[in-house]
């Protein structure tokens, strides 16, 4: 798997890889493989995970938390982006504000995103769906 990822990324010219911090240990293995093969390595960004209030990674046990489900329920995109922005350190985490994609891109810097995992709370879900 690790070899395939490294070769595939190199063939596609991947320069940046953004993934969850649960895959941080893969970066060292992939770096070693790329070096051994004489390939350039991408920059890796390992972001915090989103967890449920029980501290566990989001899963079916937390209900349907897929973006597509929120979209189907009529949740405006700006609310989802606003919640993500609050987890990324924009504004008050306890009081997210709707935000469009352009504002998110202009405001959020990947290097300043908090390293602690985000927690999807019942209050967050209520805020998303109260529109």
Spell out what each predicted region is.
Residues 56-58, 64-131:
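Non-catalytic terminal extensions that flank enzyme cores
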